[in-house]
């Protein structure tokens, strides 16, 4: 029992459970005895009805759209705290992850196009390596435990959130043809209500969660990635302490174990089960998967490192406190873990063209993300162990 308590109290435990869940999913998805059960579980329909409102989704989409909104709520709370009271409190520190994210989206997309520009079909997947899977990136970072400077973790979270916002904008502009204006209007109204609650000094977390549920539903119905609602709600929950209590910090403390030990492992289990059936060397060495692998493994760290160097060179930003440029480069490699967001963009880019393209894209995403995780972890571990 003491060993179990020690494990769950360690900073690395969440990352270890995440990796185990992902490995289990890969194993089950590729074994004849379990693949049927695995896919049946993900495709199980779950219906939610409140009056005239009805939401029909399978288990996979409930995990990705609903449970992950809770994860993004926690991320929003943590980033807000650092923006107002922590390592991102100055303008030059706050702008650093923004500049990094821009580089981390532009360069991978250009590198992918260098491989696929001559093919008008695969060219449509240019945004696939521009995405970062914040959950898996943080999971790998967590494996290094308390050795990771808090400012570096916050930098990764802020960078990945901006990256995700960029991916959502790209999806809305280039891959979505049926945005619901009415639902977007309801979402905008809910955001105004959240802002008014904050300005009026309302400190009851439940009120924000209730309005947040309306916002989540509206964003979901609009055709935009619903997890965005979680970040927005997190930004509006009050951080200031009153009588020694902060609603944002209290909610952050409550959510952390649920996210680390239930939501993220479940997310990994639901999304990591990529089938390797039908994989051939010819397909693996085609321009589509090679472009994705190059974009994630080379383009991501190159874009982030280059733009960060330019920001520092021209004194537009500062390094996060207690970090080094080498550590920033390692985070850039970890941002090459595109995984679920990349798979989502691939399904939009090729879903109406050829299912085989989606399979090759998934394989490229899996290889690129896995290599980024291994190289990024090894690089950062070496940088953390190096003498200052």
From Swiss-Prot:
- Where are the membrane-spanning stretches? 14-34, 59-79, 95-115, 125-145, 154-174, 179-199, 219-239, 254-274, 292-312, 328-348, 356-376
Q: What is its main location?
A: membrane
**A molecular function (GO) term:** sodium:proton antiporter activity
Q: Where in the cell is it found?
A: Cell inner membrane
The UniProt entry, under Pfam families, shows: Na_H_antiport_1
Give GO terms for biological process.
regulation of pH
Q: Does the keyword Membrane apply?
A: yes
Q: What does this protein do?
A: Na(+)/H(+) antiporter that extrudes sodium in exchange for external protons.
- For this entry, the protein name equals Na(+)/H(+) antiporter NhaA
Q: What is the originating organism of this protein?
A: Salmonella arizonae (strain ATCC BAA-731 / CDC346-86 / RSK2980)
Please name the taxonomic classification of the source.
Bacteria, Pseudomonadati, Pseudomonadota, Gammaproteobacteria, Enterobacterales
């Amino acid at each position: 029992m003491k060993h179990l308590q020690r494990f769950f109290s360690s900073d690395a435990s969440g990352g270890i459970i995440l990796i185990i869940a992902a490995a289990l999913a890969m194993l089950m998805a590729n074994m004849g005895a379990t693949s049927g059960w695995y896919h049946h579980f993900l495709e199980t329909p779950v219906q939610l009805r409140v009056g005239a409102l009805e939401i029909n989704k399978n288990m996979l989409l409930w995990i990705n759209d609903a449970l992950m909104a809770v994860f993004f709520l926690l991320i929003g709370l943590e980033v807000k705290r650092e923006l107002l009271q922590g390592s991102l409190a100055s303008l030059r520190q706050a702008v650093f992850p923004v500049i990094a994210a821009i580089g981390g989206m532009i360069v991978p997309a250009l590198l992918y196009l260098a491989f696929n520009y001559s093919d008008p079909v695969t060219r449509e997947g240019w945004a696939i390596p521009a995405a970062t899977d914040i959950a898996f990136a943080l999971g790998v970072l967590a494996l290094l435990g308390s050795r990771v400077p808090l400012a570096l973790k916050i930098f990764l979270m802020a960078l990945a959130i901006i990256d995700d916002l960029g991916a959502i904008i790209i999806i809305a502009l280039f891959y979505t043809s049926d945005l619901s204006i009415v639902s977007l209007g309801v979402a905008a109204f809910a955001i105004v209500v959240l802002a008014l609650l904050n300005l009026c000094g309302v400190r009851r977390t439940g009120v924000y969660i209730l309005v947040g549920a309306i916002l989540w539903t509206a964003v979901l119905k609009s055709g935009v990635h619903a997890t965005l609602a979680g970040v927005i709600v997190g930004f509006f929950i009050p951080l200031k302490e009153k009588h020694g209590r902060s609603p944002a910090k209290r909610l952050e403390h409550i959510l952390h174990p649920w996210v680390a030990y239930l939501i993220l492992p479940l997310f990994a289990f639901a999304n990591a089960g990529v089938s390797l059936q039908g994989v051939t060397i010819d397909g693996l060495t085609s321009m589509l998967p090679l472009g994705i692998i190059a974009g994630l493994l080379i383009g991501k760290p190159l874009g982030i490192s280059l733009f960060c160097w330019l920001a520092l060179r021209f004194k537009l930003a500062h390094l996060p406190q207690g970090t080094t440029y080498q550590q920033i480069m390692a985070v850039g490699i970890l941002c090459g873990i595109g995984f679920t967001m990349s798979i989502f963009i691939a399904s939009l880019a090729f879903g109406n063209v050829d299912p085989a393209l989606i399979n090759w894209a998934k394989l490229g995403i899996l290889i690129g993300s896995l290599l980024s995780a291994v190289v990024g972890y090894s690089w950062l571990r070496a940088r953390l162990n190096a003498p200052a």
